[in-house]
Every structure is written in C-alpha cells, then in structure tokens.
Design a protein with these regions (language model features):
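Acidic-glycine-rich active-site phosphate/pyrophosphate-binding loop
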Residues: 1-12, 152-162
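Predominant activation on well-ordered alpha-helical scaffold segments within soluble catalytic domains
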Residues: 2-5, 28-37, 86, 123-130, ...
Length: 191
C-alpha cells in the first residue's frame, strides 16, 4: 500500500485505510465511468472491461464470450478460465497469500483520428489506468509482446472491408497507431 510514500511526502498516514490511495477512492471513477459509458453509447462507442487473467490463469480467446463475464464473480468471459481462477484464488487464500491479475478494457466504435500524434496520444486513457493505486503497468494491443515478435508477426496489414473502407486484418496495435485511434477496437490492459 502507499502508506509509506504518503507519510514520507505529506507527513501523514491514514491508519483507517481510507486515504487518497485507498481502493475505496475508485468508487467515484466507477460511478463517473458508468455515466460516461452511457453517453458514449449514444455516439456509437461501446466501452467494456473484463478480467483477462488472475495469477497464472488467463482466458483462452477462442472460448471468449463477453456475455459470459456476467455469469461469474470474477468477470472472466471464459467459463473454464473462471473456474480455474476460482480454484487458484481459493488456494491463495488457504496459503494466506494473494496474487495479481489483468483487467482488459475494450473500446469499440471509436472513429479514426482521436488523439494526438506527439504528446497526448490518447494518453488520458492510460494515465487514468495508471492512477489506480494497485496498477503497475499498462499496455496497448499486444503491448510488450511486440518486443519479442518479429515485424512480420506484429504488423497489422491493411485491406478494404466489405463496406469499402480501409481496415486492418489484425489488431496487434490495439487500435492505436501513432498515438491516434485507427477505428479498430482500442484494447488496453492494466496489471
């Protein structure tokens, strides 16, 4: 927890656990996010998030069904992974230990060209995720996997879709090219 750093900077530690770095602080973000999601829906933009990994248990994208995330308490869109993660968490609790996880956020319907090419780069999205106390890293698209991929593996080649518009065959870039949205789903993960 951030008690140490808050005490060092401000000379104050909220022993009740309700300080600025408390997980309870995120409730305002959740409420505002729910309102923002409803407003964005009116513009044809859909935002949703789910748990894609807990400890070593990750969803299998071939089994992924977004509607399934509402059917388990871990919000995992893969029934099998959700059961494995439940078992893993029970083991962690029995050992009086904890583990990390990954939350994936997807934004669909965002038109191409949102963001800036130099400094803003849709930065507020990643910045907001990094402002959550427990988050240690954020990646877009394939993220750090790009570092161990070849250019031909990681390249999103362009094509013309059935409506005659430019599109990408894959989305390794996570819907962001040069800091701007490219009209593909924006995919952001936080761990």
């Amino acid at each position: 927890h951030a008690d140490f750093t808050f005490d060092q900077k401000y000379g104050f530690r909220d022993y009740r656990g309700g300080g600025r770095s408390s997980g309870r602080e995120t409730i305002g973000r959740v409420a505002a996010g729910a309102v923002a999601a409803k407003l964005l829906e009116r513009l044809g933009v859909r935002v949703f998030a789910y748990t894609s990994a807990i400890g070593p248990v990750s969803i299998d994208r071939s089994r992924m069904e977004i509607s399934k995330m509402w059917e388990n308490r871990l919000y995992m869109p893969d029934d099998i992974a959700a059961k494995e993660a439940e078992s893993y968490l029970e083991d962690m609790m029995a050992r009086r230990d904890s583990c990390g996880g990954v939350v994936e956020c997807v934004i669909e319907g965002l038109p191409a060209g949102v963001g800036e090419p130099v400094f803003d780069k849709l930065m507020r999205l990643w910045q907001s995720m990094m402002s959550i106390g427990a988050v240690k890293g954020v990646e877009i698209g394939d993220g750090f996997e790009a570092a161990v991929s070849t250019g031909s593996q990681n390249n999103d080649s362009f094509c013309i879709d059935s409506a005659g518009h430019p599109a990408k065959r894959t989305n390794h870039s996570g819907g962001v090219l040069g800091g701007m949205s490219d009209s593909s789903p924006v995919v952001i993960r936080a761990a």
